[in-house]
Every structure is written in C-alpha cells, then in structure tokens.
C-alpha cells in the first residue's frame, strides 16, 4: 500500500506553529514511507476566507522546505478530484442526496429560530450535551413534499445509528472509543448547499485515497461523525492519529495571544530565523527522535521518523530552545552565506552602513556570528559602532569597584596615542603592555579599557572592537569620559 497523507488548511488565516506542526508531521510520515504528501484547501467557510491566505500558506510551506506532491498547483484531478472544496459542491450534494435516498440521512426544514428555541429548552432542563430533537426525521412523505413545493429551505441531517460504538486505534493515543448515544443527528449539507466540515472532509479523503489522517487533538470529537459517514457509504476508514496540544509556558494552548512566543511563521521570517532551524524545532514538538541528538536536518528527520514516538502529553513551546536551535544553524552557515543573510536584516534607516567599507562591515558582522540567536538581533549590537553611547549609573558603579582604573586608562591611552600602525595585533600588544605597566589583569584590566574606549560594558573581542571603532573614535571616547 502506498501511503497518502494530507494537510488541509482553511484559508481563514496564515501559517502558524500549530498548523505548521500538522503539515510537517504529515510530510515526514509520508516521506519516510516513500508515500505522497498532499495539500488541499478547505475553503467552504466563504465568509471567513482571508484574501492572500492560500498563497501565503504555500509560500511559507515552501520556505520551510515542505513541498507537496499534489496540490492546487500540481493536481491530479482526473484520479483524485478537485483540491479545493469550493470546486466540489456538486459532488457533496450528490452524495448527501444519495444518503437521503438510502434513508441514512433526511431533510431538516427547521429554521434557525426553531433550533435555537429547542436547544434553549433542553438547556433549561439541565441537559448539557444538547442534541437535535429529530423533529424532521418523523415527517411524512406528504409533509416533505409539501415543504418542497413551497420551496421551504432545508438542510440535510445524518441519521446517527442507535446503540453503536466505534473504536479507533489512534496512531498517537491507542484505542479510543465513541458511543452513538452521545451524539445527535448532525447536518452534512447546509441550506445554502455548502457541505459541512465533517461531511466534506470524509468525501475528500475518500476521493483522494488518503491512508492516514494525522491532525490536532481538537478533531477527536469529529472522528465518530466521520466514521459514521464512512460506514454509510461502505468506505474503509483511514488510520487516524491526533497530535497533542502545543502549549505556551503558562500551560495554555499556544496562540497569537501567547506573550512569550512568536505564533506565525511569517514573524520568524521577518526576524531572521532560518527555515531549517524552524523545521528542526517544530519536528520536536510532540515527537522525539531516538538518542540524544536534537540538531537534525530534514533528511535526517525523514530517515529516523517513527510514528510510534509521538508523545501522548502536551508539548511546551520553548522560545529559548527555538532561539538556541536557530543560533546553532546560524553558526553552521559558511561565512559568505552568513554575511549575505545578516546584512539583509540591518536597519539601514538607523545605521548608515554605506559610510563603511565592505571589509569593515564584514569584520564587524563576523564578530557576532557566535552570539546571534536570529539575524535581526544584529541591530541590538550596532549602536556601539554607529551611534554615540552614554554611560548609565550602573556602569559608573562598576568602574568605582575596580582597582585603580584611572591609571589603567591613562597608560592605555598614552600607548594608543603614539600607535602608528593600527592593527589588531598591535592593539592586543598594547592591552598586554598596559597589564604589565599597571600591574593589573582580568576584570581590573579589561573592564576600564572596554568602558572608556568603547563606552560600553559589553561586546565581543575587545581588540577587534577597538580596531573597528578606529583610533580617533577611541581617543575621543576616552577623553570625553575623563572629563
């Protein structure tokens, strides 16, 4: 059997961590078994569809390295039908009417007001799990015909079998059972002719010969309704699997309101995360590789993927770990690719890099290669080289706690003043000579030099920073602070 798995987004929003994880796990599952990964669009909720959402979904999937074998852009319509639900209305209607003819579904002429009153009556009686009253199930043929002649609007409801239990061997959770007594007759075709989610998704999965349905746990409650529809048509079920929730650091479901994490993939792109790093990290949400290694390429993940290693517990989205993994991938870039990538994230409205040579800028950016968690972070470090810094009270307190810092600075300044050949090696030698002449080392040596020469407590290699700032700037910094 050739495995066929799908990711089926609705164009009601943009690609985020949750549906990226769904797409990615289906992709790994399919590719591990040399199967097919399909992307189809569930766009029947016309009122909520967002312009540009479909294009954005595909653009971001491709950016992550997730390329569908079949989609609206590379369909196999002749064999598997359409890849957008809005192009299958006739198919859904024909199958819904077929179930009516077979007495497995029926026309419901109840208005929304009647349904609302019915549910309110049930709630007032203490019924929590309200169900449809089946009022229209018992209409006579004459009553039905009269309603049709009067052009009364109707939906089509599925007739839930009585006293039946369905059990699935969930890929993630093991055996899960559902009882028909917990479910009321549900709509499969709305009065406007649009199929409901549970009906359309079954038809689509059957038409596309989907073998495994791997999705979020919020869909567990949909599964029994879908199994009933499979049974009604005498179709075989796919294998079902329901991935556990992704939660934020407070234990709540990750969402765009989660303050500690970026939610949308587009946000990561704009901040300068690498697609390979995001793919790697999201693959670890609710799934664990064998062994201790966590930095894994797409090909490695495909090779070692095992559906038995899904977690049954919620996975916590850890922004610190996401940043760490991205920093590992940043370090792995060769210097040319790193420079090209990071330069594209420099805020040129704030920092005039055109006034500097390419050699100077490359030297500066490479100083931070081992420090950056994401590319846009470079802007946090550039004030040191482009803007005039001022010392805060904390930095002044640091100086006052050092041994004889004024003497250290004076010795260093005098040597810098007479330095003719401005090289990193010569600057390192001056720092070394200052240590000997002032009889200090460690923090008592480096901190006063760094603060006075660069006007900052922190930074990368001191000699490199001094070299990049230039002799004039370094002496101006020292003189301004001495005053």
From Swiss-Prot:
It holds the Pfam family Anticodon_2. GO terms for molecular function: ATP binding; glutamate-tRNA ligase activity; tRNA binding; zinc ion binding. Keywords: Aminoacyl-tRNA synthetase, ATP-binding, Cytoplasm, Ligase, Nucleotide-binding, Protein biosynthesis. It is found in: Cytoplasm. Its main location: cytoplasm. It comes from the Bacteria. One of its GO terms (biological process) is glutamyl-tRNA aminoacylation. This is Glutamate--tRNA ligase. The lineage of its organism: Bacteria, Bacillati, Mycoplasmatota, Mollicutes, Mycoplasmataceae. The gene is gltX.
């Amino acid at each position: 059997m050739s495995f066929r798995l799908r990711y089926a987004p609705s164009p009601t929003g943009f690609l985020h961590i949750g549906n990226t994880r769904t797409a990615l796990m289906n992709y790994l599952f399919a590719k591990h078994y040399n199967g097919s990964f399909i992307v189809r669009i569930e766009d029947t909720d016309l009122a909520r569809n967002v312009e540009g959402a479909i294009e954005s979904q595909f653009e971001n999937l491709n950016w992550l390295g997730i390329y569908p074998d079949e989609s609206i852009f590379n369909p196999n319509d002749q064999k598997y039908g359409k890849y957008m639900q809005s192009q299958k209305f006739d198919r859904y209607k024909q199958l819904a009417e077929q179930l009516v003819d077979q007495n497995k579904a029926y026309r419901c002429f109840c208005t929304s007001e009647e349904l609302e009153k019915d549910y309110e009556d049930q709630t007032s009686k203490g019924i929590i799990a309200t169900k449809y009253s089946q009022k229209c199930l018992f209409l006579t043929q004459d009553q039905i015909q009269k309603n049709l002649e009067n052009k009364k609007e109707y939906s089509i409801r599925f007739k839930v079998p009585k006293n039946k239990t369905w059990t699935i061997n969930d890929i993630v959770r093991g055996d899960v059972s559902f009882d028909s007594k917990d479910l009321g007759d549900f709509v499969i075709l709305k009065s406007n002719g649009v199929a409901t989610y549970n009906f359309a998704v079954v038809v689509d999965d059957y038409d596309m010969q989907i073998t495994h349905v791997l999705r979020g746990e919020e869909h567990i409650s949909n599964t029994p309704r879908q199994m009933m529809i499979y049974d009604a048509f005498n179709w075989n079920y796919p294998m079902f699997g329901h991935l556990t929730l992704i939660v934020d650091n407070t234990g709540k479901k990750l969402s765009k309101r989660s303050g500690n994490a970026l939610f949308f993939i587009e946000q990561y792109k704009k901040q300068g995360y690498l697609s390979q790093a995001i793919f790697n990290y999201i693959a670890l949400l609710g799934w664990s590789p064998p062994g201790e290694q966590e930095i894994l390429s797409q090909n490695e993940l495909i090779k070692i993927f095992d559906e038995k290693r899904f977690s049954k517990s919620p996975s916590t989205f850890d922004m610190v770990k996401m940043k760490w993994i991205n920093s590992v991938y940043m370090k792995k870039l060769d210097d040319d690719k790193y420079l090209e990538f990071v330069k594209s994230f420099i805020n040129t409205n704030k920092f005039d890099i055109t006034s500097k040579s390419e050699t100077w800028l490359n030297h500066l950016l490479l100083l931070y290669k081992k420090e950056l968690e994401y590319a846009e972070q470079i802007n946090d470090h550039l004030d040191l080289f482009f803007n005039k810094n001022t010392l805060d009270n904390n930095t002044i307190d640091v100086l006052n706690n050092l041994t004889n810092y004024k003497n250290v600075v004076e010795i260093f300044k005098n040597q810098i003043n007479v330095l003719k050949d401005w090289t990193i090696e010569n600057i390192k030698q001056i720092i070394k000579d200052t240590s000997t002449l002032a009889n200090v080392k460690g923090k008592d040596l480096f901190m006063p030099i760094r603060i006075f020469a660069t006007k900052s407590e922190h930074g990368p290699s001191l000699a490199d920073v001094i070299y990049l700032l230039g002799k004039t700037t370094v002496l101006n910094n020292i003189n301004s602070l001495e005053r």
